[in-house]
């Protein structure tokens, strides 16, 4: 996907680590404790405002099951911000990060993309199987950024973090502005506010796309 269409963001990781709920948080939606495992790749388009200009971006939610990994290869292409997600209460999901980073590097090489290691479900600290120090060491080993978060307890924090990454990319790459925000729909087809004061009522679109290629 070229920047003319928007900045491509993708979340990768094993099934059940909370990728979908992180996306809900990023788009200002509510945490869904009954969220089911993603079995098709879906994307959501939205807009970030920066310096009185609007910029389009797309967030891809991917299936984490091994059977879908070959399909994910298609969707990683042209990604600019990549979140490698694991759950702190699942050592196995953390161990699989090596697979995902190698997968991304194989497809994207040494491009201008940003990769972030995300330790999700920090609210489940009583069941924590991955220590903070191990997460830090892994990020240093892979030479990527890291963030420990919770889609349940810190959804707003993750939303703000994504927006800062988008702004960083916009500044660095002189990303093309869009003329006006698109009128779209939310995760549950209802309007959601983009900010706390309710002044921005742009909506978001969810689209299922198991075989779409940019």
Over which residues does each language-model region extend?
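Inter-motif core of Ras-like GTPase G domains
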Residues: 69-91, 97, 103-107
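Conserved P-loop small GTPase signature centered on TRAFAC-class small GTPases
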Residues: 1-20, 24-28, 47-54, 108-214
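Conserved Walker B
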Residues: 63, 88, 122
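Switch II (G3) loop of P-loop NTPases
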Residues: 55-70
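Generic enzyme active-site microenvironment
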Residues: 59, 85, 118
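Conserved catalytic-core motifs of eukaryotic protein kinase domains, centered on the activation segment
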Residues: 33-34, 94-95, 128-129
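Post-Walker A helix-loop "phosphate-sensing" segment adjacent to the P-loop in P-loop NTPases
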Residues: 28-36
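Short acidic active-site motifs
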Residues: 67-71, 93, 134, 157
């Amino acid at each position: 996907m070229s920047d003319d269409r928007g900045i491509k963001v993708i979340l990768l990781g094993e099934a059940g680590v909370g990728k979908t709920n992180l996306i809900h948080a990023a788009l200002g939606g509510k945490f869904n404790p009954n969220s089911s495992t993603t079995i098709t790749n879906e994307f959501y388009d939205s807009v970030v405002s920066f310096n009185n200009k609007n910029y389009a971006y797309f967030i891809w939610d991917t299936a984490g099951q091994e059977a879908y990994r070959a399909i994910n290869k298609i969707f990683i292409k042209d990604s600019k911000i990549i979140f490698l997600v694991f759950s702190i209460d699942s050592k196995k999901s953390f161990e699989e990060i090596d697979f995902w980073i190698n997968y991304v590097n194989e497809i994207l090489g040494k491009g201008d993309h940003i990769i972030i290691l995300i330790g999700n479900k920090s609210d489940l600290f009583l069941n924590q199987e991955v220590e903070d120090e191990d997460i830090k060491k892994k990020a240093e080993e892979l030479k990527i950024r890291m963030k420990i978060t919770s889609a349940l307890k810190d959804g707003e924090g993750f939303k703000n973090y994504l927006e800062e990454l988008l702004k960083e990319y916009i500044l660095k790459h002189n990303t093309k502005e869009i003329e006006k925000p698109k009128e779209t729909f939310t995760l549950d087809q209802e309007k959601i506010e983009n900010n706390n004061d309710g002044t921005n009522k742009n909506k978001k679109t969810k689209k299922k796309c198991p075989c779409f290629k940019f």
